[in-house]
Amino acid sequence: MGVALRPLLAEYKESPGWDGLGGIAAVDAFNALYQFLSGIRQADGAPLMDGQGRITSHLSGLLFRNANLIEKNITPIYVFDGKPPVFKASTLSKRREVRENAADAWEKALKEGDEESARKYAMASSKIDAFIIDSSKELLSALGIAWIQAPEEGEAQSSFMTKNGDVTYAVSQDYDSLLFGAPDLVRNITVSGKKRIRGKVLSVYPERLRLEEVLTGLSVTQEELIQIALLIGTDYNSGVPGVGPKTAVKIVREGKFYDRIGESENAAEPDQLIGYFMDPPVERSYNIESRSPDPDRVIDLLCGEHGFTQERVEAGLERLGAKKGQATLDAWF
C-alpha cells in the first residue's frame, strides 16, 4: 500500500528507540488492523475466531499492542478511513483481486499440506469488513482509547491532527502521510517487533521521519514531493512507465513534471490529485480525550461475546491500567 518512496527516504530515517516516542500517536486504524489480521494467525494461516466463526485476531491485537504502547508512555488515537475518493477505485479493485487470489492459493496450499505457503497466502488474504470495523471501535471505547472517523482517508486526518499540534506524530506503515503533510511520521510501533521475510524472522524497530528534513534533503517543496510520488505512482494513479524514484526527482527538479505526467493513464488530472494531497477532506471537530478502561465492559465483550480466556484479558487490562494514568493527554501539553 502507499507510494514507493522508500528508496528516497532511507537516509532521513531516525531510529529513536521507544524512549524517544512518548506522546500522542494518531494511528492509521486500517493500517494497524491489517497488521493484526495478517500477523495474528495460527500455524496453518487461520485467523483467531470465536465460537460463531467471527474473526477475533484484530481484537487480540488491539488489546495487547495498545497495552504495549501505553506501557511505553504512548497514547494512541485511532483514525478510521471513511469513504474512499473516487480516483482510488482502481487500486481498491486490484487489492480485492489480490486477496481473492491469495484466498484460493491458501486453500490449495492447505490441501497440499504446505503449511508455510498456506500461512503466507492466508496473510495476503486479510480483509476488513463492517464487523471488523464496528467491533474494533467498540473495544477501543471500552479500553478508553479515543478513535476518530475520518470523512475519507485516515492518513489525511492523522496528518491534519499532527499539523494542528493536537497529536505528537502520525503512525502508519505507509509513507502517504508525508504527502498529506504530516510533519512527523512514525513506523513500526503497532507491529509485533518481528517480521518474516523469505522464511527468515527479522527484528523490527521504530522508525521516524520528519517531513522538513525530507524536503530539505531532497531540495523540494511539499508540492514537488507530491509530484515525485505521482510520477512513481500512488494509490490514486498508475505513475509514468519506467520512472522510478531517482528519475522522478530529476524530472521534478528540472521542472518537467507536467511534460511527463501525461504519459501515465490516470483517472484524474494531476492538479486534482495534487490538490487532494494538499487539502484533503478532514474532520475539523474531534475529541481525542482518553479515559480509564472499563474492565467489566472489556471482559463482557472479549470473554462473554468472543470466547477469550478471562485470565488472558485481565492480564492485558492490568498492563493498560498500570500505565493508563501516566499516559493521558495532559502529560503532553
Curated annotation (Swiss-Prot):
Cofactor binding note of this UniProt entry: Binds 2 magnesium ions per subunit. They probably participate in the reaction catalyzed by the enzyme. May bind an additional third magnesium ion after substrate binding.
Q: Does the keyword Cell wall biogenesis/degradation feature in the UniProt annotation?
A: no
- PROSITE patterns noted in UniProt: XPG_1
Provide the residue positions that the database annotates as binding Mg(2+) 1: D28, D81, E153, E155
User: According to the UniProt record, where is the region Interaction with PCNA?
Assistant: 325-333
Cofactors demanded by this protein? Mg(2+)
Identification of the protein by name: Flap endonuclease 1
Task: Give the species.
Answer: Methanocorpusculum labreanum (strain ATCC 43576 / DSM 4855 / Z)
Give the gene symbol.
Answer: fen
